[in-house]
């Protein structure tokens, strides 16, 4: 068993950082060491920002986005095209599309994708509220901005069937999204091309 290299507070910091996606123990040690070296310039402001965010961040009951207000900033933006609704798997995908700046519509966050192997079924996703929004808001087009993974495509087909009786145009992202790709990892140019070339489901 490896020995601790620092006091329990530092070891706890390293262990917590290692829980972040994409960071293992070695990367977590490097991040922790950088934070410790930059205590005043980085660690203290980061701790304050995290404490502030913890007390203020809420999930939007309307769309599933995270913000400091409910409904969120996007849902209350009256300049957005309410006849279009963009469906994404998670908030990271919403942020990626907002960075690309090619859509001016509200979003609907599913909270994941259908994945029978992982035990994620329709009841685990924010699908009932999607159908309600499409009807109540008189949506004309639903853009399925889901990853080109098997689970993403399965979810897209499920939603298409779910909305068939709503007589709404259902489109999905086309070129630019590689098979097996996740939206959060794509650059803005690729996302822009995919939005412009979306296809009818």
Curated annotation (Swiss-Prot):
GO molecular function terms noted in the UniProt entry: DNA binding; zinc ion binding
Keyword Repressor annotated: no
One GO term (biological process): DNA repair
Cross-referenced PROSITE patterns: RECR, TOPRIM
Zinc finger (C4-type): 60-75
Matching InterPro entries: DNA_Rcmb_RecR, Rcmb_RecR, Rcmb_RecR_Znf, TOPRIM_dom, TOPRIM_RecR
Domain Toprim: 83-178
This protein's UniProt keywords: DNA damage, DNA recombination, DNA repair, Metal-binding, Zinc, Zinc-finger
Superkingdom per UniProt: Bacteria
Family: Belongs to the RecR family.
Cited PANTHER family: RECOMBINATION PROTEIN RECR (PTHR30446:SF0)
Function: May play a role in DNA repair. It seems to be involved in an RecBC-independent recombinational process of DNA repair. It may act with RecF and RecO.
Name this protein carries in UniProt: Recombination protein RecR
Taxonomic source organism: Xanthobacter autotrophicus (strain ATCC BAA-1158 / Py2)
Phylogenetic classification of the source organism: Bacteria, Pseudomonadati, Pseudomonadota, Alphaproteobacteria, Hyphomicrobiales
